[in-house]
Every structure is written in C-alpha cells, then in structure tokens.
A protein has these predicted regions:
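Glycine-centered signal
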Residues: 1-2, 18, 315
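Bacterial N-terminal signal peptides
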Residues: 11-22
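Bacterial N-terminal signal peptides that target proteins for export
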Residues: 2-12
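Histidine-/acidic-rich catalytic cores in large beta-rich domains
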Residues: 26-432
C-alpha cells in the first residue's frame, strides 16, 4: 500500500500546521463563512449548497433544538468568499440532494418521493413521482435521471434471508425472518417519466452478506451511484470499466461495485483495509480524464462502525487504483487532531483540475479544499449541516457566464493560540 506521508502530509509538520486551522466543532464559539482562502493555490469556483438546517451551527442549544426537524427551503450558489450569487426556493426537505444542469436548471430530490426540476428563476418545469432517491441522483449524458430506491425486497427473496443472532453496537437482535430487508433498486427515468432501465440488488448480491453494525432491515443502504467516465482502463481493453457502466457504493457492507449497464452483471468490486477498512463510505466516483489521478476511484470514508473500531470517529478521503486496489492517496488528520475531520453520515469530495481535492464534511457544514500534501487552501463553514455540496465552474451555465467573475479575496485566519475575545466592556457592540 503506497500511502506515502503526502497523503496526510508530505511533511508531518505541514499537516500539523494545517490541522491547527481546522474548526473542531466541539467548541461553542467558532466563525462561519469563509475562514481560509488562498486564491493563488486554491481552485476557485462556485459552490452549490443545500442545508439540513439553517441553524445547525448556532451557538444556542435551545435554538438548535427548536429547529430540529425543520428544513430550510433554499438552495444557494456561493462564491469562494461566501457571497450568495443565486438562490432557488424549493420544497423544504431534510436531505435536498441536487444537481445543477448546464442549462441553469436545478434538479432536486424533494419530499414525498418527488424529483423536481426548477429553471434558473425557480419555476418548476418537470417532476417525477414515486421513486424517492433520497441518497443520490445523477443526470446521465442523455439527460435521463438515474435514481435510487430503497424498498422492501420481494417476499420470495426475503425467505432466503437466514436467521442469525447478531449483537450490533446498540444491542442483540435476530436478523432474518423477523425483519423485512430493504433492497437497493436503480431506475433510469426519461423526461417523459418512463423507466427505461432498472437494476435490483437482490437479483445480484447475496442477501446474507451483511454488517452486524447496521440498523434493522437496512441491508445495503446504497448511497451513491455514478456512471463511469471515459477512462484509461477501458481504452486499454478492460471491458469492466466501459464508460456508462454504473459505480455503486453499498454503504452498509463497505463495498463499491461496478455494474455492467448492458448485462446488469456486477463486473468489479472493491474496498480497502487501511486502519480497519472502509466504514460507511459515501460518494464513490471514478476521477475523470484530464484530472490528476484520472481512472482512480475516490470516496469519502466516513469512519462509522469500522472493523476493530480502528478509525471510528475519523473520516478519510481515499483514492484507490481499481486494478490493484492499492491506496494511491489518503487525506486524514493525524494524532489527537484526527477528531477534527469527521462526518458520521453523508459527505462528498471531488478531484479538481489543479490536483487539489474538494471536501464537504456534511455533518458540521464545513467545506474545504486541500492540496495533495494536505494543506488547506480554502475553508467555508456553513450556517448548518449540508447535503453533499458540489463544485460549479464559473462558466458552467449561460447565466453564470453573464455574471462578472467574482472577486477572489484572500482570507488569512488568526492564530488560534493568540486570538482572544475581549470582555464585553472593552469592545464596541459587534466587535470581537
């Protein structure tokens, strides 16, 4: 395994320094908005943000508690300095998975198993009902939508589930005939609402393959799907990685699969064993041609329910060579600082054109960008937790091309060891 210290930091001192600038979110007081920005070293873009809650990072526990279960109904496009460039008002929902189209339309996974498409001005121009697709949704090159459903598996398959006494972290239970297993179903839907392709995990995976640490009945919990891009493996003759085949992440069994789109067979599977192995990961993608690491698979390894509890509570970004399954690169915080990068659920990442990696630590609402050596060159702390925010190029839509290019203003954070909040009597109102 070639982790090389650059995965955490080429120089241990560099990452230790970078780790000092990270909000730990155990404190009551911390800034929000853009907290770090080095324009000369960051890859600058817009960021598309949707929230779980508008007050998740409010200092008052009472305010946070009163907002529990209330989801804001806006999705925002911000620049690197945190300025809001555009807003869509949408049907409020806790997860709000969304994708921006090159036309400027926004496709959004909303409540009541409804997928919405809004135009730039916020008008609903398309809906699809009946497939929830809460965890992920992809726009395919033909403009069809690839959706995920988690419905009970058919009864004839349910009977194949063996009774097993298991003792997950929250107490013993019987897995098998006593609980209904939710499956994983993929549907490709066209703009007329027709299902033109479908795939069902219970036809292809062993129903008795499970993790004892997962919730009752939640067999796979597929949380991300991604069509394979053009890639060097297929160019060299490896049919498993045909562009358009589907990369699927089965969170609860800690495995990533490739599904042959034509035959529907599983043609590849992978995981990793670094520090106890993959643990409830999200957002597995193959890095696109033209980007550093092209052809490798990159994922957000949350660090929840790890084997032997080896990195429980410590999140990694892991880049894998899909041929050898060797780890090519890892981002993590080290030592006692490791608690400072952790998202129990959700999360995303993206390899950027300059070799940096964009990361969204969704549970805390912290979005940041790291160089290959681990140095943080941009960081933004949202008003609350986020739902896998995405990188949007400056020229991605006609509407964005018509806007002036945003200012890219350096933000240098204070030294945490020297920064002090003065007593109220010694400062003007609003000053710190």
């Amino acid at each position: 395994m070639t982790i090389m210290k650059q995965t955490r930091s080429i120089s241990a001192g560099l990452l230790a320094l970078a780790a000092l600038t990270q909000p730990a979110f155990a404190q009551t007081v911390f800034p929000t908005g853009t907290t770090i920005y080095t324009p000369a070293e960051a890859h600058s873009s817009y960021i598309l943000i949707s929230d779980h809650t508008a007050v998740g990072n409010h200092p008052s526990a009472r305010v946070r508690a009163e907002a529990e279960g209330a989801s804001p109904g806006d999705i925002r496009l911000i620049d690197m300095n945190g300025n809001v460039v555009h807003t869509w008002e949408v049907a409020p929902f806790f997860n709000k998975r969304c994708r921006l189209l090159p036309s400027g339309n926004l496709v959004y996974v909303g409540p009541n198993k409804t997928i919405y498409e809004y135009d730039w001005d916020g008008n609903v121009v398309w809906t699809h009902e009946g497939i929830g697709s809460v965890n992920d949704m992809r726009i395919l090159p033909n403009n069809n939508r690839l959706l995920i459903a988690h419905e009970p598996i058919p009864e004839e398959y349910q009977r194949q589930v063996r009774d097993v006494e298991i003792a997950p972290w929250w107490g013993p239970r019987l897995r098998g005939s006593g609980e209904t297993q939710l499956g994983a179903d993929l549907y490709e839907v066209n703009l007329d609402g027709e299902v033109v392709w479908e795939w069902h995990a219970h036809n292809h995976l062993d129903l008795n393959l499970f993790s004892p640490a997962t919730p009752e009945g939640d067999w796979l919990h597929v949380n991300s799907v991604a069509p394979l891009p053009e890639n060097k493996w297929y160019d060299a003759g490896d049919e498993r990685f045909r562009p358009g085949n589907i990369l699927l992440n089965a969170r609860n069994i800690n495995t990533v699969y490739v599904i042959d789109k034509e035959t529907k067979r599983i043609v590849w599977e992978g995981t990793h064993n670094y520090k106890g192995g993959m643990a409830h990961a999200h957002e597995a993608e193959m890095i696109e041609k033209g980007l550093p690491g092209a052809g490798n698979i990159i994922l957000f390894d949350n660090g929840l329910f790890t084997r032997h509890r080896a990195h429980t509570g410590q999140t990694f970004i892991v880049e894998l060579d899909p041929i050898t399954l060797e780890i090519v690169w890892v981002y993590e915080t080290e030592g006692y600082a490791n608690i400072k990068f952790f998202s129990k659920t959700m999360g995303t990442q993206k390899r950027l054109p300059n070799g940096n990696t964009y990361i969204a630590e969704d549970n805390t609402g912290r979005l940041f960008q790291v160089k290959p050596d681990g140095e943080i060159v941009w960081e933004y702390v949202n008003r609350g937790g986020t739902t896998r925010p995405s990188v949007i190029p400056y020229d991605f839509t006609p509407q964005l091309r018509a806007l002036p290019r945003p200012e890219e203003l350096t933000v240098t954070p204070p030294n945490n060891l020297e920064w002090r909040i003065a007593p109220d009597i010694h400062r003007e109102k609003g000053e710190y």
